[in-house]
């Protein structure tokens, strides 16, 4: 059985080093798709690069934890900035859901304004769209617009509540991250997905060249390691041996 493999590079637009790393992993590696932070410092640079690569699927990386929001969000920001306190607010069930829904729509429109087209799909920075309070908002939004959504099915409390017309891959993995960034890890992800009988799989990654912005990230030099692995000839061969067809979210 032929299976669709989407290797999605998160954080397009975060920095020029991130952008160049993603483009390198697409041109000379196994990356097939990316998602962009519309409030990133290098988002215009990302859009410019994407126009030179029309086959690269570009989705939207919904941001609620970094930088300035596109709309006014007094209930979520501190000193006008987004941050990781969103986790505590989620635990306390004090998230400003109306503001979040409005910000999602505003970021979506900003994406269209910057890239000149709709995104191929939605996911989010730090997976905040998988919060139980936020997921229904994002799932409904994606279904209404007919675009796909990254779904980590291990964290969805009730898959029966998903909109019937919502598109996603059958499998998703965030395991290619952190301390174990190896070809062996990547190929194990594919083998496990095949064992589960999934016809489509998304593997998340963050390839980048290190620059001053990336140095400020808690996840810095592993991004460069990811780039090295994702552009290796042996990884390409291993994927081909497993009868996976490279694709984007337009293929599901």
Curated annotation (Swiss-Prot):
Record carries keyword Metal-binding: yes
InterPro entries: COD_ChbG_bac, Glyco_hydro/deAcase_b/a-brl, YdjC-like
Cofactors required: Mg(2+)
GO biological processes: chitin catabolic process; diacetylchitobiose catabolic process; polysaccharide catabolic process
UniProt entry keywords in alphabetical sequence: Carbohydrate metabolism, Chitin degradation, Cytoplasm, Hydrolase, Magnesium, Metal-binding, Polysaccharide degradation
The EC number(s) this enzyme carries: 3.5.1.105
Coiled-coil stretches: none
Broad enzyme group: hydrolase
Pfam families registered for this protein in UniProt: YdjC
Signal sequence residues: none
Chain sites annotated for binding Mg(2+): 61, 125
Subcellular location: Cytoplasm
Pathway(s) this gene product operates in, as recorded in its UniProt entry: Glycan degradation; chitin degradation
Biological role stated in the UniProt entry: Involved in the degradation of chitin. ChbG is essential for growth on the acetylated chitooligosaccharides chitobiose and chitotriose but is dispensable for growth on cellobiose and chitosan dimer, the deacetylated form of chitobiose. Deacetylation of chitobiose-6-P and chitotriose-6-P is necessary for both the activation of the chb promoter by the regulatory protein ChbR and the hydrolysis of phosphorylated beta-glucosides by the phospho-beta-glucosidase ChbF.
Binding partners and assembly: Homodimer.
NCBIfam families with a match to the protein in the record: PRK02134.1
Assigned protein family: Belongs to the YdjC deacetylase family. ChbG subfamily.
UniProt-recorded name of the protein: Chitooligosaccharide deacetylase
Lineage: Bacteria, Pseudomonadati, Pseudomonadota, Gammaproteobacteria, Enterobacterales
């Amino acid at each position: 059985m032929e299976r669709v493999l989407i290797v999605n590079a998160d954080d397009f637009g975060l920095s020029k080093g991130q952008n160049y790393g993603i483009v390198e992993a697409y041109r000379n590696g196994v990356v097939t798709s990316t998602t962009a932070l519309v409030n990133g410092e290098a988002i215009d640079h990302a859009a410019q690069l994407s126009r030179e690569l029309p086959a690269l699927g570009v989705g939207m990386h919904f941001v609620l934890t970094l930088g300035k929001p596109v709309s006014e969000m007094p209930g979520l920001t501190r000193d006008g900035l987004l941050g990781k306190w969103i986790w505590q607010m989620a635990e306390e069930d004090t998230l400003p859901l109306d503001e979040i829904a409005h910000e999602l729509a505003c970021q979506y429109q900003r994406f269209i304004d910057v890239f000149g087209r709709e995104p191929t799909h939605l996911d989010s920075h730090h997976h905040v769209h998988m919060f139980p309070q936020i997921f229904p908002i994002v799932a409904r939004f994606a279904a209404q617009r007919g675009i796909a959504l990254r779904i980590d099915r291990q964290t969805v409390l009730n898959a029966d509540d998903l909109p019937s017309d919502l598109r996603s891959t059958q499998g998703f993995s965030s395991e290619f991250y952190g301390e174990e960034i190896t070809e062996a890890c990547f190929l194990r992800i594919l083998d496990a997905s095949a064992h589960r009988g999934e016809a489509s799989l998304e593997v998340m990654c963050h390839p980048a060249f290190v620059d001053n912005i990336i140095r400020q990230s808690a996840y810095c030099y592993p991004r460069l390691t990811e780039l090295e692995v994702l552009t290796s000839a042996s990884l390409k061969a291993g994927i081909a041996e497993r009868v996976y067809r490279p694709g984007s979210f337009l293929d599901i």
